[in-house]
Every structure is written in structure tokens, then in C-alpha cells.
């Protein structure tokens, strides 16, 4: 019997609710950050924000519908 594990992909989110920026960061920054949250891999999308693959469902990612970036806390 196989066990299905759901994983998610998405933009990492900083404590301010914004996408985690990768502009002017070292080349492995996003892969390192994705690994830190137990994602399989990640990259700097258009040199602007970290996008990660296969993260645990518990990791909060940026979503347009719940965006609070720049809106205060």
C-alpha cells in the first residue's frame, strides 16, 4: 500500500508577508532557504523572489488571495 504525501510549491514569504526577495543575493540563496524549510529545491524567479518546490504543507507561502505585503500587520 502506497502513501501519498502532498507537497506544495510556491514563493517563500518573509515575516512582513511579502515574497522573500533574492535580488542581490548569492546564487544559492533561494536553494538554501528552500532547503531550510525542508523544500526539495528552489530558485530566484526573475531575480526577484525565491520560488520553492516540494515543501511541506505546513510552510506558509505567498498567495495573491491572502497577500498582506505592504498593508501593515
Curated annotation (Swiss-Prot):
One GO process term, biological-process aspect: defense response
SMART domains (alphabetical): Knot1
Distribution of this protein across tissues and organs: Expressed by the venom gland.
Principal location listed in the UniProt entry: secreted
Region forming the signal peptide: 1-7
Pfam families: Toxin_3 (PF00537)
Post-translational modification Lysine amide, affected residues: 71
Residue intervals of the LCN-type CS-alpha/beta domain: 8-70
GO molecular function: sodium channel inhibitor activity; toxin activity
Cross-referenced PROSITE patterns: LCN_CSAB
Location in the cell: Secreted
Keywords: Amidation, Disulfide bond, Ion channel impairing toxin, Neurotoxin, Secreted, Signal, Toxin, Voltage-gated sodium channel impairing toxin
Secreted as UniProt keyword: yes
Cysteines joined through disulfide linkages: 18-69, 22-44, 30-50, 34-52
A Gene Ontology cellular-component term: extracellular region
Note from the entry: Negative results: does not affect the cardiac Nav1.5/SCN5A, the peripheral nerve channel Nav1.7/SCN9A, and the voltage-dependent potassium channel Kv1.5/KCNA5.
Similarity remark: Belongs to the long (4 C-C) scorpion toxin superfamily. Sodium channel inhibitor family. Beta subfamily.
Comment block on domains: Has the structural arrangement of an alpha-helix connected to antiparallel beta-sheets by disulfide bonds (CS-alpha/beta).
Function: Beta toxins bind voltage-independently at site-4 of sodium channels (Nav) and shift the voltage of activation toward more negative potentials thereby affecting sodium channel activation and promoting spontaneous and repetitive firing.
The protein, known as: Toxin Td11
Lineage of origin: Eukaryota, Metazoa, Ecdysozoa, Arthropoda, Chelicerata
